[in-house]
Regions:
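Membrane-interface capping segments at transmembrane-helix boundaries
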Residues: 51-55, 118-130
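Alpha-helical transmembrane segments of multi-pass membrane proteins
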Residues: 1-2, 70-78
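Membrane-helix exit/interface motif
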Residues: 11-17, 44-52
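Residue-level detector of alpha-helix boundary/anchor positions
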Residues: 22, 66-69, 92
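Interfacial segments of alpha-helical transmembrane regions
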Residues: 56-73
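"…centered on the first transmembrane helix and the immediately adjacent amphipathic helix/loop
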Residues: 2-36
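Interfacial helix-loop-helix junctions of multi-pass membrane proteins
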Residues: 7-19, 79-99
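Membrane-interface loop-to-helix entry segments
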Residues: 25-47, 96-119
Length: 130
């Protein structure tokens, strides 16, 4: 989700930078650091995923559950902590952001709910087949 946020909202739409309380240069640097961290996490996750495949230990239902739960947690953390509590940045500037905030956090809740639902189903299926 960090990659989607970084690419779409930071680079393509230019709505904000990760850290907007300073100069444009600092904002661009903060975007680069965020993108670097997100990319390192993605590569590490790919190695972990490949290791599960190699060991034939991948449980696809649990993997999808974790994927959507992670998307939702990231979205809500960004919307609540980064946008509202720390005020690192807002979704947009020079507009009423209320609708954007509701849409951003609602999307996070939907993703989180989907992840939790998939987790419950995966656990039930694992218990039934064990």
């Amino acid at each position: 989700m960090a990659a989607v946020d970084e690419i779409v909202f930071h680079q393509l739409l230019h709505w904000h930078h990760f850290y907007d309380a300073s100069t444009l240069g600092v904002g661009l640097l903060s975007d680069g650091l965020l993108h670097t961290g997100e990319l390192l996490a993605l590569v590490a996750g790919c190695f972990l995923f490949a290791d599960l495949l190699r060991r034939r230990a991948l449980a696809p239902a649990h993997a999808w559950a974790g994927f959507f739960t992670g998307l939702g947690v990231f979205q809500l953390f960004d919307g609540i902590v980064d946008h509202k509590l720390l005020r690192v940045h807002q979704i947009r500037y020079d507009v009423d952001i209320t609708l954007y905030d509701w849409a951003w956090n609602a999307a996070g809740l939907v993703l989180l709910f989907l992840g939790i639902t998939l987790t419950v189903r995966a656990r039930r299926h694992a218990s039934a087949t064990a």
